Amino acid sequence: MSSAPTTPPSVDKVDGFSRKSVRKARQKRSQSSSQFRSQGKPIELTPLPLLKDVPSSEQPELFLKKLQQCCVIFDFMDTLSDLKMKEYKRSTLNELVDYITISRGCLTEQTYPEVVRMVSCNIFRTLPPSDSNEFDPEEDEPTLEASWPHLQLVYEFFIRFLESQ
């Protein structure tokens, strides 16, 4: 019989007071989009004239049509799909922000429900599932919203809408 010393199996010590001892390996969070809604076919928005290019008598109706178009939600996880329409919606949102900032009396009783509908379609959404149960703001990166280019403009529009009256 050999009397070679045997080493005990390795045992990791667990510090019950430190969350680091229980923490899983960290993975980098990728961008996610809470606005993904499966669409079978590419989204087509009908190009509309600019608000400044139509007579003032036609602007309220065109404003409502543009608000309705901005209710369309795109899949920002697929960066190559609907590029033209995503850009069109972004420019329309910019135009709407400028329009309610500059124009006096453009918001009528008829426009309020459409404004609320457009804002709610874009802002109220299901958040993406969390990658882990724990979130440490000091060490973890926040989940990035892929649709932020449109969301930022919707928030800006909503702020201008609230300030306009």
Swiss-Prot record:
Lineage top rank: taxon? Eukaryota
One GO term (biological process): signal transduction
Task: Kindly list the positions at which N-acetylserine occurs in this protein.
Answer: 2
Q: Where is the composition biased (Low complexity)?
A: 30-41
What does the tissue specificity note say? Highly expressed in testis, lung and brain.
Q: According to the UniProt record, list the residues that bear Phosphothreonine.
A: 7
Which Pfam families does the UniProt record give?
B56
Family the entry assigns: Belongs to the phosphatase 2A regulatory subunit B56 family.
Q: What is this protein's function per UniProt?
A: The B regulatory subunit might modulate substrate selectivity and catalytic activity, and might also direct the localization of the catalytic enzyme to a particular subcellular compartment.
Native organism is: Oryctolagus cuniculus
Q: Which InterPro entries match?
A: ARM-like (IPR011989), ARM-type_fold (IPR016024), PP2A_B56 (IPR002554)
What UniProt keywords apply to this chain's record, in alphabetical order?
Acetylation, Cytoplasm, Phosphoprotein
Protein name according to UniProt: Serine/threonine-protein phosphatase 2A 56 kDa regulatory subunit epsilon isoform
**SUPFAM superfamilies to which the protein is assigned, alphabetical:** ARM repeat
Record-level Gene Ontology MF annotations? protein phosphatase activator activity
Gene (name only): PPP2R5E
As for subcellular location, the record says:
Cytoplasm
